[in-house]
């Protein structure tokens, strides 16, 4: 497997990238559990383990990526990509989870933070609706148009309804075989067939590069609108195989 950050080879034993030194930890593609070094099958469910990008908190900060753990009462939930003014509970006031300025054209989302698996991508991770009020739209679109490619590492399991909200310049989205639910339906990008900023320019298709087979993808929960957009050519599927 190639490093998702630099394209270098991973050391077969340590799972460190031989190019940039990035750390990878084996993650079960079926249940999302982190696995010990040397384990090829998940001891919990028997699922296949694949290397997932494992960042430190400092590395996440440098990359402009926020994570948080929602909580309600005495229950603490999994780790998600995203931000929340309230920190948790049933009340959520989203704030941007990707805060790098200026944004990178290619954003890589890891699967773990210091060995702890990241479950999914929360709503409005890249931008929030408040950024598109009159007077702020031009600035928001200028930032979002810079993000052309998003790569999600092996182990992440879910993308929420507004996880890629208004990623206006998105051209390629690479998703792992561990994905079980893709709730984002691209409606905000293709509702009129034009680029979201209403400039009359036709929106180019988004290519989803899926690290699995077409049969695998058919098991992922998606919306009915998703397949409508595939049929219309707004979304192009590319199956990379196992």
Task: Describe the predicted segments one by one.
Residues 2, 16, 27, 41:
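The −1 position to Zn-ligating cysteines in a subset of zinc-ribbon hairpins
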Residues 7, 32:
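Detector for the canonical C2H2 zinc-finger "Cys2" submotif
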Residues 13, 24, 38:
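Short metal-coordination and nucleic-acid-contact micro-motifs, chiefly zinc-binding Cys/His arrays
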Residues 21-29, 45-53:
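Short Cys/His-rich micro-motifs in 6-15 aa windows
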Residues 52-100:
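Short beta-strand/loop segment at the start of cytosolic alpha/beta domains
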Residues 62, 68, 74, 101-119, ...:
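Structural signature of tandem-repeat unit edges
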Residues 124, 160-163, 185-188:
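Consensus positions within tandem repeat domains that build extended binding/scaffold surfaces
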